């Protein structure tokens, strides 16, 4: 049983970062089949009664940093005979974006679909777009031996967390649809992107998805730069390239260290081979 409110109790150090496949084939499949889930940490939520920012408290797991939130919810048809789903809340509404993505098991068997939605504040069709993103997962009824009764499992996060650390030019090159349909990593976005720990998808939700902390770089692993060291001059377009070391008098493989910069990289292996 879930407590009525507050964080779900989990062992110290527990972090919940399921993959798309795990959400569908383990958690949602067991849910619709009324099977027990070993560690039941996904709450049931009425999506129409909660705003995305309320999920941070309602769906908290443990006491550690968290920047994406998970819950089960019923698909609520907007019209009795229609196929459109009502995802309106008091403050706004969730709007589907892009194309649904098929989710496959390792054996190439399709088990379900992932729909991406963006939260808008206000009333359709004139709402204001926010950074809150939701991935809604549904099972393929043809591929499971259970009766799907309207349950879906959802992951909510904030888009901004995935853009932290990018310069303006890089951010401009990011396509919204690619961002929203990012592959979810089994590690928290906090380890994959830079960001603040409580937003996640930073204030906007991340998959993201995770409130990001700046990734830890081991700068000690990089050689120190000596300002007195002279770098080789890049050759001009009019200057012919020098011959490989083996063609020079007394040339050896160690001569590679004195080659111009354009010889470093993928060509270096060929030059080493020629010099033998």
Curated annotation (Swiss-Prot):
Tissue spec. comment: Expressed in leaf blades, developing flowers, embryo and callus. Weakly expressed in roots.
Organism whose genome encodes this protein: Oryza sativa subsp. japonica (Rice)
Composition bias, Basic residues: 206-216
Pfam families: NAM (PF02365)
Gene Ontology, cellular component aspect: nucleus
Domain notes: The NAC domain includes a DNA binding domain and a dimerization domain.
Record's subcellular location: Nucleus
Protein name: NAC domain-containing protein 76
């Amino acid at each position: 049983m879930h407590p009525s409110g507050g964080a779900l109790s989990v062992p110290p150090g527990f972090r919940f970062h399921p993959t798309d496949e795990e959400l569908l084939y383990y958690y949602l499949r067991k849910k619709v089949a009324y099977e027990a889930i070993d560690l039941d940490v996904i709450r049931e939520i009425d999506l129409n009664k909660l705003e995305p920012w309320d999920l941070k408290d309602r769906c908290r797991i443990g006491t550690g940093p968290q920047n994406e939130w998970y819950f089960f919810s019923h698909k609520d048809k907007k019209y009795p005979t229609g196929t459109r789903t009502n995802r309106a809340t008091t403050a706004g509404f969730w709007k589907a974006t892009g194309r649904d993505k098929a989710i496959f098991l390792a054996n190439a068997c399709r088990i379900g679909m992932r729909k991406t939605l963006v939260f808008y504040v206000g009333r359709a069709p004139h709402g204001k777009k926010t950074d809150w993103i939701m991935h809604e997962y549904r099972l393929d009824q043809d591929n499971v031996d259970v009766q799907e009764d309207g349950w879906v499992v959802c992951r909510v996060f904030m888009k901004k967390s995935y853009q932290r650390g990018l310069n303006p030019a890089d951010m401009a090159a990011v396509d919204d649809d690619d961002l929203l349909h990012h592959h979810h990593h089994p590690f928290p976005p906090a380890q994959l992107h830079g960001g603040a720990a409580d937003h996640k998808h930073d204030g906007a939700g991340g998959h993201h998805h995770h409130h990001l902390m700046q990734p830890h770089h081991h700068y000690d692993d990089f050689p120190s730069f000596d300002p007195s060291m002279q770098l080789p001059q890049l050759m001009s377009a009019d200057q012919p390239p020098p011959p490989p070391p083996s063609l020079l008098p007394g040339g050896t493989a160690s001569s590679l260290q004195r080659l111009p910069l354009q010889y470093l990289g993928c060509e270096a292996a060929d030059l080493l081979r020629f010099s033998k």
